[in-house]
């Protein structure tokens, strides 16, 4: 069993979706008889299973005889832009100040024309300009980094390291020169020692032939023993 709906004031559930021609005729007859306003009682009076909001929206945007169709003229466009800056997206207030224009028409025009025009006018710069700017900024970076001043204590350490490096190089060079000079000179004591060693070899007595022969015989006897 259906219960009475608080929105429509009639039995049954609320119908949603597109309106039929029969429903449009019922709504027209109701408005012609009772006039606009008091939308809470319109569904009951018209015999519609529609909510009051749906009835009001259908009448103001589609069925009202004074609705003006077609493109907006230049004055209307200027007025919409001016009011939109003041009121924002309050479409019902803007449409109320434009005779014959509906809330949907004003809203759709702003969403399709004004926003599209605004996006076209705010196109970002071409990629080539951005690349050129980035390239120039990259070139300038080494110059800016070169101007960075180091702390005083760090400068002192660098100076000390450079000084020690120079002193080390000078000492290495002097040592190399000394070794090269020594390589070009011969120590006379070396020659004297060599001569003494050779003379000592000459003084060693030679083994007699007889002793060598006896030594060989001794080895043979021991080998076959």
UniProtKB/Swiss-Prot annotation:
Activates DODA1 and CYP76AD1 in the betalain red pigment pathway. GO terms for molecular function: DNA binding. No interactions with bHLH. Residues 11-67, 68-118 form the HTH myb-type domain. Transmembrane segments: none annotated. CDD domains: SANT (cd00167). SMART domains: SANT. Keywords: Activator, DNA-binding, Nucleus, Repeat, Transcription, Transcription regulation. It comes from Beta vulgaris. This is Transcription factor MYB1. GO terms for cellular component: nucleus.
